[in-house]
């Protein structure tokens, strides 16, 4: 401590331990003050739309990011995203902020789980540094030999063993063999090894005149086996210093004369050992491992055919073999059906006996080797295989029926050269622990973790890999801990769900070992079964324990209970939210008065989602048989109609594959609606005539335009425009309903084109979004704003919340508008403005706007609605409102199928389909189906275990 400086007070250290936010006013936040303890796990909770994300992301993260960007030079700032300063008085004690959101982080088709977690980068280095190249011919390791290697090989024999040091005859283009041997004679070399016999060069020239007159380097050059070898020295094995020195000189001479090759022949066995200073073996020249060799983003490593994508346009296996439960004999090869093309199948079956090919085995049970025979052929089968069939079609393309058949089976398929590995063939020759990099990236992460945990390396390799292995194993353990053990490193990033992407980013953050940072996470429990939540909490605590502050926007009860500090935003949503209802450790919630906070009421049990008194009966259903897409194991599933069906299971068990990739797409195909091809299944049967339409309701934004809003989506604004156009002033001025549209020329402000704001780009500062000077943010021309209904113009109406608008239009008996708006209120969105831009809505709000649209349509035709995790972003209280809306759909004669982890939804289902028992390869089976009570009674699987607690609560 320096003299003259006061000792730090307790108050100072207390403040240093906290992040202080004063007067936050972003979006609906009402000038709130928040204190967040540093190095803690903090959960921000509250109703959907209450202002949680406004505090966590739009205030804390935005300011942390802005401060980081501001610290850079003006030159660097022009290349970075420009950040707004959030509306608040001040934020003190804010560490560098990192946001991990629910967005799929990469749309790049080259990005994989391995590259995004950086594990693949470490694997590349590992294989480049300690990988051993194995010859595919002999299975021996390929090495660049040194004289020491040759000496060690010789000394491996017992003392006194006779051997010769040999070199291949150096081939000089344009010279005859005789001329080359004459040069050796001049150099003092006098003998050759001819098939193990030692002969003098003069004798060989006399005995083989024809061979000696052959010109080297010409096409008529004899095979390498017929060439004699040049004898450099004759020795016997001895560990004597002089003998070893002589051997070393001879070996160096052999390498020089043999152009990098040397041979040892031992007697009396005449065994021949080959050594080379070149990286070659078995007549193949190999490339030495470098990290670029294993990079599919580098031209040095990427497969030349698919250029590192792993997929090419070719013959699609799924189109050729649509039903893998059939055998070759039963007609699994679709293009070999019919009278004419069936001859190919018959001929293949006849010839298959030559190699014992199992023609009665289902296609999905065939080994990779057996599939290669079927697709690429075998010498014993002649030219009968699938590839040869399509080559025949290509040769005869002048026939229109062949061109049509080729087009029918063409699609994106796995690259035949690299078999989906994305790498050149040389990469597969390099092994670590007996496995190639391709083998490792195709293993599930849980298996890969075990592989590295038990990896045995030589002392030298272990020393080289000492810094690489901990980086790889720690990241693999983190991925397993966040419930992603079923993924492979080769899985493309753009096929991951939002929840999976977020947890991969979380594992990457843990692996990076950053400390002293602020991590802000948006519902990391999304897509996570209750079984995995405890492991997620452990990971969040690890992130905290290394010295970070972790702020989590979350609704999951287990995570709320595990928090060090809770901030409850509310009390309601929208304009009725934006306040701190209570903040403190979990134990403090008992002091909050009942009815003040929905969160506290649910935690204490005062408010809860009740289990239905009875389950709906059903007698109509749609059945899928033999579903084998992705990891599904040929399961038979029945989806009841006219009830609420919930599909449950741990992460990676196959829920999305079953419902979205197979069931939904199969229904689309049944209705002849264009869409992606469904995953593999044998048949779909049942009461398909009982439904007339199908709708898949996801969380994607309701509109891409900034002018898109809830009122336009549910068609309520159409009624409002008609109402405004019917007013007397509109009639006098000749206004039509289109005049009141901000998406069309006519009535909208020509300056801002109906946006109400003008964006001004600033080179080194954040873009300025200024109120339009022409319309003052009201979107329309003045003459349009002069038209009023009951004292309100179109801008005033768009500024109303849904609740206010319903009250206003009900008062003035405009029931057509109320009818369109009511469903938005019913799904719990009464707090949002009519004209609120869809860009500002959360994923959960977008999904509920879509639900409201379907509720407002009142379709007479029975429709099948499929929801993908509709509880995302929803508080306990919001889930209750959502369930009422879903039940309203069912009461109108529709059917509802939900992919969901939330047990409050599962306990309210009429029918549960539980997949599992684990994720990835260990999933894809039907664990249980039936009512929640029947699933619990069966007692199998994780869902039954956790659901039992909910039903008994």
Which residues make up each language-model segment?
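Conserved phosphate-binding elements of NTP-dependent enzyme cores
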Residues: 2-953
């Amino acid at each position: 401590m320096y003299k003259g400086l006061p000792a730090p007070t307790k108050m100072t250290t207390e403040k240093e331990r906290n992040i202080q936010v004063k007067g936050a006013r972003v979006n609906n936040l009402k000038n709130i003050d928040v204190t967040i303890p540093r190095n803690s796990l903090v959960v921000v909770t509250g109703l959907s739309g209450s202002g949680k994300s406004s505090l966590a992301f739009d205030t804390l993260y935005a300011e942390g990011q802005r401060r980081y960007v501001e610290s850079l030079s003006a030159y660097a700032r022009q290349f970075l995203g420009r950040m707004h300063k959030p509306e608040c008085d001040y934020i003190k004690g804010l560490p560098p902020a990192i946001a991990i959101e629910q967005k799929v982080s990469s749309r790049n088709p080259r990005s994989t789980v391995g590259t995004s977690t950086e594990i693949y980068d470490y694997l590349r280095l590992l294989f480049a540094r300690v990988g051993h190249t194995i010859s595919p011919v002999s299975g021996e390791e390929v090495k660049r030999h040194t004289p020491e290697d040759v000496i060690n090989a010789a000394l491996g024999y017992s003392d006194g063993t006779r051997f010769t040091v040999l070199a291949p005859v150096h081939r000089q283009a344009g010279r005859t063999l005789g001329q080359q041997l004459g040069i050796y004679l001049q150099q003092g070399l006098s003998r050759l090894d001819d098939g193990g016999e030692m002969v003098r060069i003069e004798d060989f020239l006399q005995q083989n005149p024809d061979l000696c007159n052959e010109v080297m380097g010409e096409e008529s050059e004899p095979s390498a086996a017929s060439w004699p070898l040049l004898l450099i020295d004759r020795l016997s094995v001895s560990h004597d210093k002089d003998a070893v020195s002589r051997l070393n000189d001879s070996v160096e001479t052999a390498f020089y004369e043999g152009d990098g090759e040397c041979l040892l022949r031992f007697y009396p066995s005449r065994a021949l050992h080959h050594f080379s200073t070149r990286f070659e073996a078995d007549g193949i020249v190999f490339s030495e491992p470098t990290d670029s060799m294993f990079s599919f983003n580098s031209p040095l490593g990427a497969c030349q055919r698919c250029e590192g994508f792993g997929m090419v346009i070719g013959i699609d296996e799924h189109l050729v073999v649509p039903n893998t439960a059939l055998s070759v004999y039963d007609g699994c090869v679709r293009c070999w059906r019919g009278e004419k093309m069936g001859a190919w199948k018959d001929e293949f079956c006849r010839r298959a006996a030559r190699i014992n090919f199992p023609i009665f085995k289902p296609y999905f049970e065939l080994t990779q080797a057996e599939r290669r025979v079927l697709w690429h052929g075998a010498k014993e089968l002649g030219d009968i295989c699938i590839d040869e069939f399509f080559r025949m079609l290509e040769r005869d393309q002048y026939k229109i029926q062949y061109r049509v058949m080729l087009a029918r089976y063409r699609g994106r398929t796995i690259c035949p050269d690299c078999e989906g590995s994305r790498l050149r063939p040389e990469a597969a020759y390099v092994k670590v622990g007996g496995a190639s990099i391709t083998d490792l990236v195709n293993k599930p992460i849980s298996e890969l973790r075990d592989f590295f945990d038990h990896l045995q390396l030589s002392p030298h390799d272990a020393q080289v890999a000492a810094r690489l292995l901990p980086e790889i194993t720690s990241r693999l353990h983190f991925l397993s801990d966040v419930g992603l053990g079923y993924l492979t490193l080769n899985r493309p990033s753009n096929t991951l769900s939002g929840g999976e992407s977020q947890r991969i980013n979380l594992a990457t953050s843990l692996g990076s070992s950053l400390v002293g940072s602020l991590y802000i996470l948006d519902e990391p429990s999304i897509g996570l079964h209750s079984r995995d939540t405890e492991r997620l909490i452990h990971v969040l605590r690890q992130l905290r324990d290394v010295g970070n502050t972790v702020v989590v926007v979350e609704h999951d009860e287990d995570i709320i209970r595990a928090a060090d500090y809770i901030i409850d935003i509310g009390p309601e949503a929208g304009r009725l939210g934006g306040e701190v209802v209570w903040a403190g450790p979990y134990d403090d919630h008992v002091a909050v008065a009942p009815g003040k906070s929905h969160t506290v009421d649910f935690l204490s049990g005062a408010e809860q989602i009740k289990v239905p008194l009875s389950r709906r009966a059903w007698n109509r259903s749609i059945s899928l048989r033999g579903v084998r897409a992705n990891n599904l194991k040929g399961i038979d599933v029945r989806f009841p109609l006219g009830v609420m069906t919930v599909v449950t299971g741990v992460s990676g068990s196959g829920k999305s594959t079953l419902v979205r990739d197979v069931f939904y797409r199969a229904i689309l195909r049944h209705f002849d609606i264009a869409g992606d091809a469904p995953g593999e299944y044998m048949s779909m049967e049942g009461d398909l005539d009982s439904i007339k339409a199908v709708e898949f309701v996801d969380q994607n934004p309701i509109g891409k335009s900034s002018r898109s809003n809830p009122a336009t989506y549910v068609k309520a604004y159409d009624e409002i425009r008609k109402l405004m156009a019917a007013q007397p002033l509109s009639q006098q001025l000749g206004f039509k309903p289109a005049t009141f549209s901000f998406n069309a020329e006519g009535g909208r402000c020509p300056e801002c084109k109906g946006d109400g704001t003008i964006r001004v780009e600033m080179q080194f500062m954040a873009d300025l979004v200024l109120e339009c000077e022409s319309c003052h943010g009201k979107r329309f021309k003045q003459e349009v704003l002069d038209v009023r209904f009951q004292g309100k113009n179109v801008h005033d109406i768009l500024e109303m919340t849904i609740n206010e608008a319903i009250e206003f239009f009900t008062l003035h008996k405009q029931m057509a508008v109320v009818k369109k708006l009511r469903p938005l209120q019913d799904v719990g969105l009464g707090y949002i403005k009519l004209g609120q831009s869809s860009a500002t809505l959360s994923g959960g709000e977008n999904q509920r706007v879509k639900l409201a649209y379907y509720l407002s349509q009142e379709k007479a035709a029975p429709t099948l609605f499929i929801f993908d995790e509709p509880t995302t972003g929803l508080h306990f209280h919001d889930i209750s409102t959502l369930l009422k809306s879903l039940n309203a759909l069912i009461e109108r004669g529709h059917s509802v199928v939900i992919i969901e982890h939330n047990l409050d939804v599962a306990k309210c289902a009429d029918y549960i389909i539980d997949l599992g028992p684990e994720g990835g390869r260990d999933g894809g089976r039907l664990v249980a189906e039936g009512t929640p009570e029947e699933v619990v009674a069966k007692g199998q699987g994780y869902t039954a275990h956790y659901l039992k607690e909910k039903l008994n609560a």
